[in-house]
């Protein structure tokens, strides 16, 4: 009876929020484990069903209304701006080491973890760097953690670099775009 009631709650929640495809895969796995645990140790299965809900919630992908201005630069991530400063371009890019404006956004576990295009334009380059998984809020995380660098160029040939950095909790970066893809902010 509990699994059927839980399934009804899940269907209702899915109808409220769009969920990223990666979330469905992990949700299915966690639900199968939860269901199997019902026959072994039911109290643990209840906890695992609740964890399954968390998986769906973590991978939510809500619709966004972005400005119609093609020259606008929007935040590529939900989160808190934790630093605005001047910094050199990431050394892995071919853009030199001239200082540029850097805006650091920290995403905690309650933020939407689907990143967006900061500008309308074409992906000029994608650079993946394997690394460690320090707490993302530490300064050393931006240099030592796993990261994915996206270089985009708009119609005015201006470049924007967006760096995704993995952390202790969100330990992997999945990119679903390719070089030369045109994106809209």
Question: Where do the model's predicted regions map?
Answer:
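Contiguous, well-folded functional domains in the mature portion of proteins
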Residues: 1-185
């Amino acid at each position: 009876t509990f699994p059927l009631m839980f399934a009804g709650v899940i269907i209702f929640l899915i109808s409220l929020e769009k969920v990223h495809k990666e979330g469905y895969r992990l949700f299915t796995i966690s639900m199968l484990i939860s269901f199997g645990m019902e026959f072994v140790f039911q109290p643990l299965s209840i906890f695992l069903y609740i964890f399954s809900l968390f998986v769906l919630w973590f991978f939510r992908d809500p619709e966004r209304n972005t400005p119609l201005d093609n020259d606008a630069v929007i935040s590529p991530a939900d989160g808190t701006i934790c630093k605005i400063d001047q910094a050199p371009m990431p050394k892995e890019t071919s853009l030199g080491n001239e200082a540029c404006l850097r805006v650091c956004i920290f995403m905690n576990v309650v933020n939407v973890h689907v990143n967006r295009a900061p500008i309308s334009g074409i992906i000029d380059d994608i650079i993946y760097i394997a690394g460690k998984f320090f707490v993302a809020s530490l300064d050393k995380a931006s240099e030592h953690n796993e990261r994915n660098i996206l270089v985009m160029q708009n119609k005015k040939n201006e470049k924007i670099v967006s760096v995704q950095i993995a952390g202790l909790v969100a330990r992997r970066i999945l990119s679903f775009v390719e070089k030369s893809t045109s994106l809209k902010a």
